[in-house]
Design a protein with these regions (language model features):
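Nucleotide-activated chemistry modules centered on ATP-dependent adenylation/adenylyltransferase
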Residues: 1-379
Length: 379
């Protein structure tokens, strides 16, 4: 509204990464025109987000602090890219967004716009004028825009890869989120098995129902897992600007998919494949979180992650229960546990007893040498 009053021809754009229903998108459009936009568009980048980043996050089992599936932070960059692309298409002179000066999103948006839309002015009225929510509400009311502006205790960001929750008890380090803070609640109490089938690291079936559309597969798993209240947690981490941040989230699909995928990899990858993939995946997740998706090293990491998935095919089985789940097993033609060389702790067929003793003696050589020279350092 303020920009239109200042003489700008405002083109409002909503970049959707799977977090809006049709009703919400329609309401966005109506509100945009009520606030003075000359044009409104929805830019659906959900599938682009999956193809260009989300599938690599699954390949890498990316969890920030072994906890948070970087739901919002990974989506923001694709929202920003979509907005920058649209701004170029219409020849925009400026891009405006509503970030404050207190969080990570201002960095993700501004950096992307600076790189993807060079020369285009970036307008951030909320940040520049240090506006409070109440000041924004007062301004809208004064200019005839009436709506329910009741301040929510929590703020939510919803996307295909989970929902983040901020505010309320999260501002007190000694408190956790109450049940009413979550958008989805437990409706299933009976245990059930969930089968997730992968082909080279990508989901192809859920409970033996085939899915060509990976987004629909994720949504199906979310529907199943959310009914058990699975995927709730709270992450405390370091923000890009250097302060600690605390965010609650509910992410049933990410938690179930990543743990199912990780389980399948335990059976189908070598020790060193798993080790090195974990190292580069941690870097990948950190770079996504810290607004470095456009860094030239990212495609190199993606190539390594893709290569690592060539044998990650099969079905992982999980047992779901209210507020939790456990891994059961896998069914895969690439199951390395099926080796005919031996059964762990039971019987071996690939070596003799004397060969085993020789292997152990050779393996111990470096330690025998060291402690032979430094007997006083024995532990």
């Amino acid at each position: 509204m303020k920009l239109a009053q200042d003489g700008y021809e405002v083109h409002a754009a909503c970049a959707n990464t799977g977090g809006f229903s049709e009703e919400q998108l329609k309401a966005n459009e109506q509100n945009a025109y009520r606030l003075g936009a000359a044009k409104y568009v929805t830019l659906d980048v959900t599938h682009e987000y999956y193809e260009k980043s989300l599938k690599y996050m699954i390949y890498g089992n990316v969890m920030r602090n072994n906890c948070y599936p970087i739901s919002v932070s990974s989506e923001r960059i694709f929202q920003a890219i979509a907005i920058a692309r649209y701004a170029r298409e219409i020849g925009a002179d400026a891009i405006a967004h509503g970030s404050t000066g207190a969080g990570n999103d201002q960095i993700r948006f501004d950096m992307t716009f600076l790189v993807m839309a060079p020369g285009v002015e970036i307008i951030t009225l909320t940040r520049d004028k240090a506006l409070s929510r109440q000041e924004e509400v007062d301004y809208l009311n004064a200019h005839g825009f009436s709506a329910d502006f009741t301040k929510l205790k929590y703020s939510y960001n919803v996307g295909i890869w989970g929902t983040s929750i901020c505010g309320g008890e999260l501002l007190d380090s000694s408190k956790g989120l109450p049940e009413e803070a979550y958008l989805k609640h437990v409706t299933q109490t009976e245990e059930q098995l969930l089968r997730i089938t992968f082909d080279k690291g990508e989901i192809t079936a859920v409970n033996d129902e085939p899915f060509d559309d990976k987004i629909k597969a994720i949504q199906k798993i979310e529907e199943i897992g959310a009914a058990y209240g699975i995927g709730r947690d709270c992450n405390v981490g370091d923000t890009i600007i250097g302060i600690k941040g605390r965010v609650g989230f509910e992410a049933a699909a990410p938690k179930l998919i990543i743990e199912a995928h990780r389980l399948l990899e335990k059976y189908t990858l070598s020790k060193w494949q798993q080790y090195w993939k974990d190292q580069v995946a941690n870097w990948y997740g950190m770079f996504l979180h810290e607004s470095q998706y456009l860094e030239p090293v990212m495609p190199d990491i993606e190539a390594m992650l893709t290569s690592s998935q060539r044998n990650v095919s099969g079905t992982a089985i999980l047992k779901l229960r209210p507020l939790g789940f456990e891994t059961v097993g896998v069914d895969s033609v690439n199951d390395l546990l099926k080796s005919k060389l031996g059964e762990y702790g039971e019987m071996q067929h690939g070596w003799t007893a004397e060969e085993a003793k020789g292997f152990i003696k050779v393996l111990s050589t470096p330690l025998r040498v060291y402690y032979g020279i430094h007997p006083d350092e024995e532990r």
